[in-house]
UniProtKB/Swiss-Prot annotation:
EC number: 3.1.-.-
GO (cellular component) term, any one: plasma membrane
Listed Gene3D superfamilies: F1F0 ATP synthase subunit B, membrane domain, Hypothetical protein af1432, K Homology domain, type 1
Compartment annotation: Cell membrane
Protein's name in the database: Ribonuclease Y
Organism: Aquifex aeolicus (strain VF5)
Gene name of this polypeptide: rny
């Protein structure tokens, strides 16, 4: 039984008792002697009344129950809403706490990583400092050894000078004796005897001086060459330079041979427009699916190649479109050139160079000297000079700066005309470069003396970069003319029987007439020939001069 049924029964029982009592109170006789029996009508009325009361009670109970139920539902709903709200807030709080914990964990992890990174950085710095300290100690020991060597050289030179002085005294004594002997013989006049003695003494002194000079020079060369090779080897072993290749043509692949006719155009209008705007020659031959771009200017070739590739990809090839594409590519290449210069400056860690020089530095990438890319050559010179400066304790940054800019005039020398050194000096002054850079621009072609030690390193690095095997190449005609000119210069000296340029012009062997040239004169000739070659011939790298004097004595056994 549910609660409603129980309530209805209780209400019905109560109503019945109440009605019965009312009925009994109204119908009771004053003093009856017998128990009256209610009539059916009365019972029917009581029953009807009871049913009404029960019905009203039931309705009231339903209303009360409904209100109680609604109130209970409302309370439950509010409780559920509050519970959901509390649960949601609790979940949000949990999520927030989780996020906070994760964030804290992440921060702690980042801090730990930063601390570890700093520790590793400090360890590397400490190792570098220890290594640098060892290098400095090693360098200090080497310098001390070098100082001791210098002191020994000075002692040897002083000893040689004393020997030379003693020899001069002996010569003077010999002159006096010969003069007395000549006067005694009286066959010559005093003046003639004096001239004869002077001639003999000069020859003897010249021979002795040449011998002494050779000994001192060979010793100094040997020691200096050892130190120089050591420094140069340390600098150059860290480079991987490129081999020069002389390209004057570039090829562009075509989707099909049909494009050759479209590139030529009606009556050749397209190809003429393209060649006029780009300054190159388009070679269209029987080679399948290939067009060749020919020009001695690398920048023009690159612009023409890019423009032609865009025209082929676009498919619209006519004079107006060609002009539009070529102009667009030229504008893009100006920015590309500046970007190349900027990247080069940052690669060499020269951030304080005036941005106005970026364009000229980038333009060196499209210039060549003896088929060697000028920008790559300048970077190579900068690296070698900087490394040698570090080895010698000089300003490595200044050496790299001067090395990079020593050929900056070549960027526009073909446009303005004139010497690239003068143009380079003008650019360096315009953009506020230091005096050492200007000195390097002039001194590497010996137009002015070297005034800074870093500039001397730049000149040496320039010679190394140009002289290494594979660095530069010449055209065949220029190469042959240079070898012929080299042999002509050598043959112009008196006593030279023949001359042979070998090793691709990097060595010349001089055969002298032994009857006209003595050993001492051959030695002096080996000094004079290189000077004249430097004055009259323009050549890459260096040329070794070998003077050969051969004496043959032939006899026959009979």
């Amino acid at each position: 039984m549910d609660v409603l049924s129980i309530l209805l029964i209780l209400v019905a029982v109560g109503v019945g008792i109440f009605v019965g009592r009312q009925f009994l109170g109204q119908k009771q006789a004053p003093a009856p002697t017998y128990q009256p029996v209610p009539s059916p009508q009365i019972l029917e009325e009581a029953k009807s009344k009871a049913e009404e009361i029960i019905k009203e009670a039931k309705e009231k109970a339903e209303v009360i129950l409904k209100e109680a139920k609604e109130s209970a539902e409302k309370i439950v709903r509010e409780a559920e809403e509050k519970a959901e709200k509390l649960i949601r807030e609790a979940k949000e709080e949990v999520e927030r706490i989780k996020e906070e914990v994760e964030r804290r964990k992440k921060e702690l992890k980042e801090r730990e990583e930063n601390v570890l990174a700093k520790e590793r950085h400090l360890d590397r710095r400490w190792e570098a400092l220890e290594k640098r300290e060892e290098e400095l100690l090693h360098r200090e020991r080497e310098l001390k050894d070098f100082e001791r060597s210098l002191e020994r050289w000075r002692d040897e030179i002083r000893h040689k000078e004393e020997e030379l002085k003693h020899m001069k005294e002996e010569v003077e004594e010999l002159k006096k004796k010969e003069l007395e002997e000549l006067q005694r013989i009286a066959k010559l006049t005093l003046e003639e005897a004096r001239q004869e003695i002077i001639k003999k003494v000069e020859e003897e002194a010249k021979k002795d001086a040449v011998k002494l000079m050779k000994v001192i020079e060979e010793d100094a060369k040997r020691r200096a060459e050892f130190e120089a090779k050591k420094i140069i080897a340390t600098a150059t072993q860290r480079l991987a330079p490129q081999i020069a290749v002389n390209y004057t043509t570039t090829t562009v692949e075509l989707p099909s041979n049909e494009f050759k006719g479209r590139i030529i155009g009606r009556e050749g209008r397209n190809i003429r427009t393209f060649e006029i705007l780009t300054g190159v020659d388009l070679i269209i031959d029987d080679t399948p699916d290939i067009v060749t771009i020919s020009s001695f200017d690398p920048l023009r070739r690159e612009i023409a190649k890019e423009a032609l590739q865009r025209l082929i990809a676009d498919g619209r090839i006519h004079p107006a479109r060609i002009e539009e594409v070529v102009d667009e590519v030229k504008r893009e290449f100006d920015e590309k050139i500046r970007k190349i210069g900027e990247e080069t400056v940052y690669e060499l860690d020269l951030h304080d160079i005036n941005p106005g020089l970026y364009y000229y530095i980038g333009k060196l990438y499209f210039r060549t000297s003896y088929s060697q890319n000028v920008l790559l050559h300048s970077k190579e010179v900068a690296y070698i000079a900087g490394l040698m400066a570090e080895e010698l304790g000089l300003d490595a940054k200044l050496a790299r700066r001067a090395g990079l800019l020593h050929d900056i005039g070549k960027a526009i020398s073909h446009e303005l005309g004139g010497s690239h050194t003068d143009i380079g000096v003008e650019l360096a002054r315009k953009y506020g470069e230091p005096d050492a850079v200007i000195n390097a621009i002039r001194a590497h072609h010996e137009e002015e003396p070297v005034r800074y030690p870093e500039v001397a390193l730049v000149c040496a690095a320039d010679a190394l970069s140009a002289a290494r095997p594979g660095a530069r190449r010449e055209t065949l005609e220029a190469y042959i003319r240079r070898l012929e000119k080299l042999e002509e210069i050598v043959k112009s000296f008196k006593g030279v029987a023949n001359a042979y340029a070998v090793q691709a012009g990097r060595e010349v062997r001089v055969i002298v007439n032994p009857e006209e040239i003595s050993d001492e004169e051959a030695y002096l000739l080996s000094k004079e020939i290189p000077k004249k070659i430097e004055e009259e011939l323009d050549f890459p790298g260096q040329i070794k001069v070998v003077v050969i004097r051969e004496t043959r004595h032939v006899e026959y056994a009979k």
